[in-house]
């Protein structure tokens, strides 16, 4: 009996250490009924996050789906890749007004007032920052929407006609590692 229990515990310990190293990854889709951003997938390019960008020009280990793949670790949001770490930041200061961007490299820092943690998936399966939904602003590069965090500014960064969106999480089963342009 004792030997069986010991063997069972040993096999559980091996199974726990053999857990897959791939984080739980997901894509994001903008939800805003009655607006052109509705169902636009999220993209990463030029150090920023967009919705509906026609080409993100990422360097991938397979075919670029055209959409960014994300994961959350310890409240921080990352782009899924195999090379250097690409971490999302938010600048809610008066200067940043909710700017969302990303840095490349383990020691890269964002703007002076940037925040790295506060990301989560809420009970409705939406990505939120500090419990708040995101904002999409039209007329960015290639007619895409730029994505911003809520910082109490309806039209951040001098944009016009911005709308609040829900960023619906879509789990990815077989993520493709990419490096997104800075």
From Swiss-Prot:
What are the alphabetically sorted keywords of the record? Cell wall, Glycoprotein, Secreted, Signal, Sporulation
Please state where this protein is localized: Secreted; Secreted, Cell wall
Span of the secretion signal? 1-18
* UniProt record, GO biological process: conidiophore development; phialide development; sexual sporulation resulting in formation of a cellular spore; sporocarp development involved in asexual reproduction
Where mainly located? Answer: secreted
| List of glycosylated residues | 57, 107
Tissue specificity remark: Mainly present in phialides and conidia.
What effect does gene inactivation have here? Leads to reduced sporulation and division of phialides instead of forming a single flask-shaped cell.
Domain of life of the native organism: Eukaryota
Explain what induces or represses this protein's expression.
Answer: Expression is highly induced by the V-ATPase inhibitor bafilomycin B1 and by oncanamycin A. The promoter contains two abaA ATTS DNA binding motifs.
Give the CC-aspect GO terms: extracellular region
Reported function: Cell wall protein involved in development of asexual structures such as phialide and conidium development, and thus required for spore formation. Plays a role as a general stress protectant produced by the fungus in competition with antagonistic bacteria.
The similarity annotation says:
Belongs to the phiA family.
> What is the protein name for this chain?
Cell wall protein phiA
Taxonomic lineage per UniProt?
A: Eukaryota, Fungi, Dikarya, Ascomycota, Pezizomycotina
């Amino acid at each position: 009996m004792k030997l069986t229990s010991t063997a069972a515990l040993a096999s559980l310990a091996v199974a726990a250490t053999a857990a897959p190293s791939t984080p739980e990854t997901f894509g994001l889709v903008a939800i805003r009924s009655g607006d052109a951003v509705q169902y636009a997938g999220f993209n990463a390019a030029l150090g920023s996050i967009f919705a509906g960008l026609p080409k993100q020009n990422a360097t991938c280990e397979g075919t670029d789906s055209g959409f960014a793949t994300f994961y959350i670790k310890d409240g921080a949001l990352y782009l899924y890749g195999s090379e250097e770490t690409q971490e999302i930041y938010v600048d809610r200061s008066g200067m940043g007004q909710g700017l969302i961007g990303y840095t490349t490299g383990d020691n890269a820092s964002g703007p002076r007032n940037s925040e790295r943690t506060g990301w989560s998936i809420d009970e409705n399966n939406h990505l939120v920052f500090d419990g708040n939904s995101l904002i999409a602003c039209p007329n960015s590069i290639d007619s895409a929407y730029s994505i911003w965090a809520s910082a109490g500014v309806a039209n951040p960064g001098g944009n016009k006609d911005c709308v609040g969106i829900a960023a619906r999480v879509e789990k990815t089963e077989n993520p493709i590692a990419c490096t997104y342009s800075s």
